[in-house]
Amino acid sequence: DEMYDSWSELLTELYVLNPELNIVFTVSPVRHAKDGLINNNQSKSRLFVLIERLKENFPLSYFPSYEIVVDALRDYRFYKKDMIHPNEQAVDFVWSHFVKTYYTETNMDLIKRISKLKSAKNHQIMNPDEIEGEKLKKWIFEERNKLNEEIGGNFNL
């Protein structure tokens, strides 16, 4: 099958580059109504079968965002007015399940630090020459450098 062969080739290359890679697949809960609901369901069914086949041969996981929205949040109050896209409440619900499933405490701490750093960077300093403004700029610089050392990259806001 063409889809399987393409994905298999890509995943093989990725795992050669990084054997510790954690790959998560999901199927979008958004309906592609413009293709017709029958075609949408057939397409998603093919994706489910593909992912199951890939899981048999590669160390990857599946996150059930489709199932959460379609089954757990099956009420249309969880959709936007177009009745196709999940609303903010549904997205938050799915995201909270994703975080509980895949994030470690270390990940969560890192996300909090990055959010705090982004907020500080976006803060409007009334008078940048004042001592408080200088302290904030210094803290942003130092915190960004600490993050770069910890994550081994070039973290830039």
Explain the meaning of each model-derived region.
Residues 12-41, 114-121:
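Active-site segments of SGNH/GDSL-like serine hydrolases
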Residues 11-15, 19, 31, 52-55, ...:
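Hydrophobic/aromatic-lined pockets within catalytic cores
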Residues 22-24, 45-75, 97, 111-113:
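Extracellular serine-dependent O-acyl
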Residues 66, 89-92:
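N-terminal targeting/trafficking signals and adjacent low-complexity tails
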Residues 58, 81-82, 92, 96-157:
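Conserved catalytic region of serine esterases and O-acyltransferases that act on ester linkages
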